[in-house]
Curated annotation (Swiss-Prot):
Its main location: cytoplasm. One of its GO terms (biological process) is L-homocysteine biosynthetic process. This is Adenosylhomocysteinase. Binds 1 NAD(+) per subunit. Pathway: Amino-acid biosynthesis; L-homocysteine biosynthesis; L-homocysteine from S-adenosyl-L-homocysteine: step 1/1. Gene3D superfamilies: Adenosylhomocysteinase-like (3.40.50.1480), NAD(P)-binding Rossmann-like Domain (3.40.50.720). It comes from the Bacteria. GO terms for cellular component: cytosol. It is found in: Cytoplasm. The gene is ahcY.
Amino acid sequence: MSAVMTPAGFTDFKVADISLAAWGRREIIIAESEMPALMGLRRKYAAEQPLKGAKILGCIHMTIQTAVLIETLIALGAEVRWSSCNIFSTQDQAAAAIAAAGIPVFAWKGETEEEYEWCIEQTILKDGQPWDANMVLDDGGDLTQILHDKYPQVLERVHGITEETTTGVHRLLDMLKGGTLKVPAINVNDSVTKSKNDNKYGCRHSLNDAIKRATDHLLSGKQALVIGYGDVGKGSAQSLRQEGMIVKVSEVDPICAMQACMDGFELVSPYKNGINDGTEASVDAALLGKIDLIVTTTGNVNVCDAGMLKALKKRAVVCNIGHFDNEIDTAFMRQNWGWEEVKPQVHKIHRTGKTVDPTNDDYLILLAEGRLVNLGNATGHPSRIMDGSFANQVLAQIHLYNEKFADLPVAEKTQNVTVMVLPKKLDEEVALEMVKGFGGVVTQLTAKQAEYIGVAVEGPFKPDSYRY
């Protein structure tokens, strides 16, 4: 293992450097002041202790903001064991602060793939035996998958899973469809206060920040291609536009494609006539040869494939703000091209072969090895953005824990294994706390107005079908 374990009475942790704890604690205190919804829930439910008895396995980016989430769960009665969901996303000072507080955490920036899985397993195990966990909080679905594949006995006690991101939700839905999902789950990702804040506004803030920190490039006047125009793509396109880039968008969904056009972006395809037939001849080399920066945002596989990588302009920057590194064909790059590390999470990928020639100018600049760029090359979304996402996680954990799925008779369990979105009333509760944090005042409906539009005075205010 590459990280150092520092026993000091409490040893149920592994972080890079426990001496960073004081720095981490100072940043956590600042983050708390920027997370009004999460801190509001902490105050609102502290006396009630709605998570008393909950034992939560957590696998989500081990950042300063996540530290506030962890300590909120504990303040509401839970015990937790934690790891990061990405090998590059841990902020070592945050992990150290959590460990110093006596909370089991296994995470450090720059884990190997083997260390990453080891860290997840250390949360599942305590003293070498499966911990009696009864809740799961996941981001991307790796923890959920490992539990189903290797520790199905743990799932017998689990009341539910709350999933943070698009990729993890896709995996849950695939498991549900295939009949392999063993416990109910809440899709936190599609809560309005998550998807519109984290996915859209968060990426608007953090994408250009990461690129500038990694490259020191001026982005103005250069051409960018954003692959995907869902909420993450929308925020990413805005992030690059506000830097003065000339932004083009590629999409497969006609509705999202229409939105890109209506938002003033040129809709293009990296393939001639939009058709990828698997040959290099189908790649629009004329288009890609002018692109200075390409970013993938889709949660899909090989959306920046080998043919596209070959056709990109010399010295183009390549990055991903989706969850996994398979959006970009990094496997092809490893097999065929030379990698030269410029600094941590910044590589020159030499397209002239496996040999690295420092004088060669035919290279790409790959950020975070194709993994999540905003956490690999910067510090991710700001606290105020993550406030909404993590408040949703807290309410989702409370909701599933109260349902007590694991205590149901066996005959009733199958029909209760679902993947649901957080109830709208809870989504509105998070939004209201966020508005209060901005100093905003929400106007209340009169009884007559509420009756006229067919809602309760206290909400919910929109049907589930409403698109914000």
